[in-house]
């Protein structure tokens, strides 16, 4: 199986299966000399970790990360960094009944047809559990980008099912299990309780941002920053759509309002999402993703088995009624990995480039000039 490595200069190779002994990744290209410990990574893994509330899967994995290589005396050495996360709470017997059946909405059918074999336990390689190593790698990228550029990556849920979530403050996001930017999440909790009792699932919309991004990241024509971001986000399990900036709202906007006017003190708006012509403009990167409803539900559904016989599929096991609830740190990590890759690329080619443009005195802190 190919397609397991993300990035080139900051390359992350992901390995493992949902119910295997362990999952992990190898990071190749991390600059040397950065202080790094498991504690620097564990915080983001804890944000993504299952079993943290009644609204997510009750699979109880500690997701404790181990650094196996690439760090000496507390600092990165420039050699590959191997990160390992043990699987400790597998319950493979839950998947015995569906081992020869294809669950609607899952990768079962396509994996079987492509490879002629599949691991049905927890989805095997197609499981969202494999996002944990990417969150770990993203934490490494976040740390380097924060230290070198002061970059800040944040995310929140802006919609769950039919419920739009108003933005109140970033301060509310870590205080509730939904990563919602609002103080009172009782409506969201009641909605999820009803959904779970009905044996159904729902989708979600997640917003992620990156602040203090330098101007100049992105490589036209085909490695544009927004193209790479979309590629990364679509690599997250269950993501079905990506928006940059105004996204689909651009359809109803006019050119007189969509184009972000520029003044001596900076941009007036950010409909472009911080990217112009595939290159970062210095504004915040603004990205939203749409996540489909969880495919693993207890309600019976029509399908076939590996012999093409009609079957009624009832999925057992422990599953997220909305995978979007834990997707915020995943989307943050993937955005950080894209930015890390392009910072290294831009430094290699354009590190000595200087222009006559001066930084506007009262421009936002995101609009830094290289």
From Swiss-Prot:
Pathway membership: Metabolic intermediate biosynthesis; chorismate biosynthesis; chorismate from D-erythrose 4-phosphate and phosphoenolpyruvate: step 7/7
Any single Gene Ontology cellular-component annotation: cytosol
EC number: 4.2.3.5
UniProt entry keywords in alphabetical sequence: Amino-acid biosynthesis, Aromatic amino acid biosynthesis, FAD, Flavoprotein, FMN, Lyase, NADP
Family annotation (Gene3D superfamilies): Chorismate synthase AroC
Cofactor binding: number and manner: Reduced FMN (FMNH(2)).
GO biological process: amino acid biosynthetic process; aromatic amino acid family biosynthetic process; chorismate biosynthetic process
InterPro entries cross-referenced by the UniProt entry: Chorismate_synth, Chorismate_synth_AroC_sf, Chorismate_synthase_CS
CDD domains, alphabetized: Chorismate_synthase
Reactions it catalyzes: 5-O-(1-carboxyvinyl)-3-phosphoshikimate = chorismate + phosphate
Requisite cofactors: FMNH2
Binding site for FMN: 125-127, 237-238, 277, 292-296, 318
Gene Ontology molecular function: any one: chorismate synthase activity
Binding site for NADP(+): 48, 54
Family: Belongs to the chorismate synthase family.
Biological role stated in the UniProt entry: This reaction introduces a second double bond into the aromatic ring system.
Subunit structure: Homotetramer.
Descriptive protein name: Chorismate synthase
Organism, as annotated: Variovorax paradoxus (strain S110)
